[in-house]
Amino acid sequence: MAFDFGERRIGVAVGDTILGIPHPLATIDTAVTDERFAAIARLIEEWQPRQLVVGLPMHPDGEEHELSALSRRFANRLKGRFGLPVWLVDERYTSVIAEQLLEEAGVKKGRKQKPALDQVAAQAILAGWFEQPGTAV
C-alpha cells in the first residue's frame, strides 16, 4: 500500500508485489490527523498490506523538498501505529506522471481531478517502489 502524502489530502494505492502492478485506491481528504489515521486503519484492515510505501518529495536536483520532513514524520507514524515495514521512495515527477495518465484517460483538469490525481500519484509511487525499493524507515 502506497501513500502520496499531502497536507490536505493523501492519495492511496495498492498493488501486487508478485505481479508488480499498482492500482489507485482512495483519497483521504482531511487535514485532521486522527481522521486520517482512522481512514488508513480501515484501509489496512480491508487490504491487509505487508508493507507500506510513502512518497518522499524531492526537488528536481535531488534536494529534499519543504514537505520532506512532514512525509518522513508521516512514515514514522505509520510504522509506529501499524507495525508494518515502511519504505520511503523518491516521488519526483509522480504528479506529472499522474496528470499525464489522467489526461490520457480523458479526466479534465480541475477540482474534480484532484482526488484522482492523488490516487494516481500514489500509484506512480508504488510503481517506482516495485522497480526500485527505497529506504526503510
UniProtKB/Swiss-Prot annotation:
Gene Ontology CC: cytosol
InterPro entries, alphabetized: RNaseH-like_sf, YqgF, YqgF/RNaseH-like_dom, YqgF/RNaseH-like_dom_sf
A matching Pfam family: RuvX
Taxonomic path: Bacteria, Pseudomonadati, Pseudomonadota, Betaproteobacteria, Neisseriales
Family per similarity comment: Belongs to the YqgF nuclease family.
Statement: the UniProt record of this protein carries the keyword Repressor: no
Listed GO biological process terms: rRNA 5'-end processing
General function of this protein: Could be a nuclease involved in processing of the 5'-end of pre-16S rRNA.
Claim: Cytoplasm is one of the keywords in the record: yes
Keywords: Cytoplasm, Hydrolase, Nuclease, Ribosome biogenesis
Species annotation: Chromobacterium violaceum (strain ATCC 12472 / DSM 30191 / JCM 1249 / CCUG 213 / NBRC 12614 / NCIMB 9131 / NCTC 9757 / MK)
A GO MF label: nuclease activity
Enzyme class: hydrolase
Compartment(s) where it occurs, according to its Swiss-Prot or TrEMBL record: Cytoplasm
Record-linked HAMAP family: Nuclease_YqgF
Protein name as catalogued: Putative pre-16S rRNA nuclease
Superkingdom: Bacteria
Listed EC numbers: 3.1.-.-
